Amino acid sequence: MLFRSKNPHVKNYRAYYGILLDMTAAVNARFPKEGFSMQYAPSIVGQVWSNAQSLGYGNYFVSDLSNPITDDHYYVNSINGTPTIDIINLSAETKTGFAPHWHAQTDNMNLIDRETMKAVGQTLLQVIYNESAVN
């Protein structure tokens, strides 16, 4: 992502904003408002979480704040300047803050949940739909 932060895929291309989906399909996923997302793109976080709430997905898109996570969105924000958020499943129950199966051999297709994917997908479709109505 560091390369793309400095070298857009199309010359002079500039996105309005970006959304990174990071481990967003697990059963009982919780997506707090991630620290760098709130620092660089609080209005995008607000749009996404507001849409999730209005669709009834507040149990996934929680209003808790998390510590900053250094991932692709950090570089897109800090190098490219495109406001970008990270929707990431975090757990207060583990030492790492990530789900127990994160980067483990137990991470497999059985952990993917249709309802979580539906919540994320419908939320983002609503965000995109609302964006296209404005522009």
Please state what every model-predicted region is:
Residues 13-19:
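A conserved short beta-strand
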Residues 7-12:
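Surface-exposed acidic, glycine-flexible loop patches that form ligand/cofactor-binding
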